[in-house]
């Protein structure tokens, strides 16, 4: 594995891959890698000739009340994990290289950002869109891999690729879970022992609602209530339980097409998110 920090060196490596006709799988991250990231790298390894992972803690996606400096960083640990996962190039640029001087052009994400977690993180997805546009232009990937754990981000990336006619295949990858269904997250370590026992109820709630739809329920409020009823048996505080079309993230008046049921729940020292994709068309084929 090569670790590259210099943009010009990355461009040379990409040029070489393209001259050899090699496909490139790209996994953008902010580092502090966990099993979810490594699953993305593994899938990219299976589907491409070369795998490039970036580690860049992007200052543009941190809000005024979010501590950019406190974000965990351990590049040596991450480099070892990336190499073991079969990554060919680990791109670790400096913020001064990614954002040299004043911006001449910026990006504002108009849709898909004012619901779910984006509602309380103004400007966050603008920062995501800016850095991904830069990274996509540098890496020129055949495919880009993102985890559905953050399904709203996947929806925003889908819109970015579509609106700017980027010749990139977006590959959403299912959430990696513990044996009891809890979505894997670095935040899980902040749960107390009792909260850790309760936390799998989030996914159980989502599954229950999906099963309700599969059984014929077509009232969005009933589907949402079924999930809420289960989550309310935990000690966590519900931030939201919401249902939207996917990936458009528009409100739904009836159960139809492809949708996302998403939840956010605050425990004493950890805020957990999870979601499930409900596709009526797929259910009708079963």
Swiss-Prot record:
Annotated keywords: ATP-binding, Cytoplasm, Ligase, Nucleotide-binding, Pantothenate biosynthesis
Active site: 37 (proton donor)
InterPro entries cross-referenced by the UniProt entry: Cyt_trans-like (IPR004821), Pantoate_ligase (IPR003721), Pantoate_ligase_C (IPR042176), Rossmann-like_a/b/a_fold (IPR014729)
Subcellular locations according to the entry: Cytoplasm
Keyword ATP-binding: yes
EC number(s) from the headed UniProt entry: 6.3.2.1
UniProt GO MF annotations: ATP binding; pantoate-beta-alanine ligase activity
Catalytic activity of the protein: (R)-pantoate + beta-alanine + ATP = (R)-pantothenate + AMP + diphosphate + H(+)
Example of a GO biological process term: pantothenate biosynthetic process
Ligand binding (ATP): 30-37, 147-150, 176, 184-187
Disulfides per UniProt: none
One cellular-component annotation, GO: cytosol
Pathway terms, separated by semicolons: Cofactor biosynthesis; (R)-pantothenate biosynthesis; (R)-pantothenate from (R)-pantoate and beta-alanine: step 1/1
Pfam families named in the record: Pantoate_ligase
Chief place of localization: cytoplasm
Domain of life: Bacteria
Class of this enzyme: ligase
Binding site for (R)-pantoate: 61, 153
Assembly notes: Homodimer.
Reported function: Catalyzes the condensation of pantoate with beta-alanine in an ATP-dependent reaction via a pantoyl-adenylate intermediate.
Family, per entry: Belongs to the pantothenate synthetase family.
Other notes: The reaction proceeds by a bi uni uni bi ping pong mechanism.
Record-given protein name: Pantothenate synthetase
Organism name: Bacillus subtilis (strain 168)
Gene name, Swiss-Prot/TrEMBL: panC
């Amino acid at each position: 594995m090569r670790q590259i920090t210099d943009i010009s060196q990355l461009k040379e490596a990409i040029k070489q891959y393209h001259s050899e006709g090699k496909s490139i799988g790209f996994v953008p991250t902010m580092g502090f890698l966990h099993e979810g990231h490594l699953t993305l790298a593994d899938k990219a390894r299976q589907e491409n000739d070369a795998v490039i992972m970036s580690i860049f803690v992007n200052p543009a996606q941190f809000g005024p009340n979010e501590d950019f400096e406190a974000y965990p960083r351990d590049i040596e640990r991450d480099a070892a994990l990336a190499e073991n996962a079969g990554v060919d190039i680990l791109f670790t640029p400096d913020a001064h290289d990614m954002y040299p001087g004043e911006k001449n052009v910026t990006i504002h994400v108009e849709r898909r950002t004012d619901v779910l977690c984006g509602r309380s993180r103004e400007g966050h997805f603008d920062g995501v869109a800016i850095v991904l546009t830069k990274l996509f232009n540098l890496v020129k990937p055949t495919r880009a891999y993102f985890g559905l754990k953050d399904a709203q981000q996947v929806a925003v990336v889908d819109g970015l690729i579509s609106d700017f006619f980027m010749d990139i295949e977006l590959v959403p990858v299912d959430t990696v879970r513990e044996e009891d269904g809890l979505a894997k997250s670095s935040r899980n370590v902040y749960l107390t022992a009792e909260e850790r026992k309760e936390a799998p109820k989030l996914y159980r709630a989502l599954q229950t609602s999906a099963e309700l739809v599969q059984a014929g329920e077509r009232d969005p409020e009933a589907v949402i209530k079924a999930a809420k009823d289960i989550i309310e048996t935990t000690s966590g505080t519900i931030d939201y339980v919401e249902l939207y079309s996917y990936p458009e993230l528009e409100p739904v008046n009836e159960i139809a097409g492809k949708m996302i049921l998403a939840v956010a729940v605050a425990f004493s020292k950890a805020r957990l998110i999870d979601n499930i994709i409900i596709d009526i068309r797929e259910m009708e084929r079963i």
